[in-house]
Structures are given as C-alpha cells and as structure tokens.
From Swiss-Prot:
A stretch of 270 kb of the mitochondrial genome is duplicated within the centromere of chromosome 2 resulting in the duplication of the gene. The expression of this duplicated gene (At2g07739) is not demonstrated. It comes from Arabidopsis thaliana. It comes from the Eukaryota. This is Uncharacterized mitochondrial protein AtMg00370. Keywords: Membrane, Mitochondrion, Transmembrane, Transmembrane helix.
Length: 199
C-alpha cells in the first residue's frame, strides 16, 4: 500500500513537471503562434486556389514564401523586443503602408497599363507579376495589427516574459512546432507535386 502510494505520488509529480515544463509551454504557444489566423491568410488562399498552370504554380510558391517570411518576422518580433516595438509603432506602419497602398491602388489595379512596356517579352512581364505577389503577402502579414488587430501577439509576449525562466528552450520548442507545421502543410505537398511532375 505504501509502495503504491509512493509510485502514484512520483507519477503525479512527474506529470506535473512535464506539464509545467518549458518545452510543453513552448509547444503550446508555438501552436498558438502558428494558428493565429488573420486577413493575410486570404491572400495566401487566393493564390493557392485561384491560379492554375505554370504561372499559377509560381504564384503559389511566391505567395507561400512571402507569407512564411511575414510569419517568421512576426514570430521573431515576439522574442525580440526592438522589432516588436518597431512593428507596433503607428509611424512605422504608416511608413510601410503608404507606399504599399499607393503602389497597390494606382499601379497594380491598373495592371494592364502598368505591365504594358511595349518592347518587353512575355516572360519578363510574367516574372514581374509573380514578383509582386511576394511583397503583397509579406507586407499584408505585417498589416494584421493595423487592419484587424489581434491580441494574440501581446498575450504571447506577456506570457513569455513572465512564465519561462529558460527562454532559449522555450524559443526552440516553439520554433520546432512552427517548422513542423510548415513541413506538413506546405513543403510536403510541394515535394509530392514535384515528384508527380517528374514522372
């Protein structure tokens, strides 16, 4: 009887240590960081669903790369306070947003005239359209705080600052979850598509 209560007590203690460990907390908040859905997912979804053909595949890769770069910048801003403060200031967002909005509304919406250079080849114009998809997804990911603000980033920063003593292990475990999601969601289907196209 004493031996069973000793084993049960040690098992409960071990479970509590595992649940309250930095790795589990990092994995949990890594999931929250990965799944914080905002309006930037609409651009990614548009590029992945609507475009077809060779140009569509290149746009999908460009949109996914821009989205991942924006997600990585937001993820780094959680753990790097100067970047978090820079992205949170209204003047920084204005400096980023004004040229983007001017370009987007005056040139991109008028793309028939904007891409009509006269002496350029079709591939050069197509490459310019594909290259414009990358900054569109990257910058719009940073605009999440301006357009539809979410308290997810602020909560993660506060919990990170007050919860964990071993900050490097927390960052590593959070990053492992984000990389795993990236591999499962985007890299593996692209690899399958590559294998199908080779055969």
């Amino acid at each position: 009887m004493v031996f069973q209560s000793f084993i049960l007590g040690n098992l409960v203690y071990l479970c509590m240590k595992i649940i309250n460990s930095v790795v589990v907390v990092g994995l949990y908040y890594g999931f929250l960081t990965t799944f914080s859905i905002g309006p930037s997912y609409l651009f990614l979804l548009r590029a992945r669903v609507m475009d077809e053909g060779e140009e569509g595949t290149e746009k999908k890769v460009s949109a996914t790369t821009g989205f991942i770069a924006g997600q990585l910048m937001m993820f780094i801003s959680i753990y790097y306070a100067p970047l978090h403060l820079a992205l949170g200031r209204p003047h920084t967002i204005t400096v980023l947003a004004l040229p983007y909005l001017l370009f987007h509304f005056f040139f991109w919406n008028n793309h028939k005239h904007f891409f009509d250079y006269g002496s350029t080849t079709r591939n050069e114009m197509r490459n310019l359209r594909i290259q414009c998809v990358f900054p569109n997804n990257l910058i719009f990911k940073l605009f999440n705080h301006l357009i539809l603000p979410s308290s997810m980033l602020a909560r993660l920063v506060n919990i990170y600052m007050f919860r964990c003593n071993n900050k490097m292990l927390f960052v590593t475990s959070s990053f492992v979850v984000c990389v795993r999601m990236l591999l499962v969601e985007w890299a593996f289907p692209l690899f399958q598509l590559f294998l199908v196209m080779k055969v």
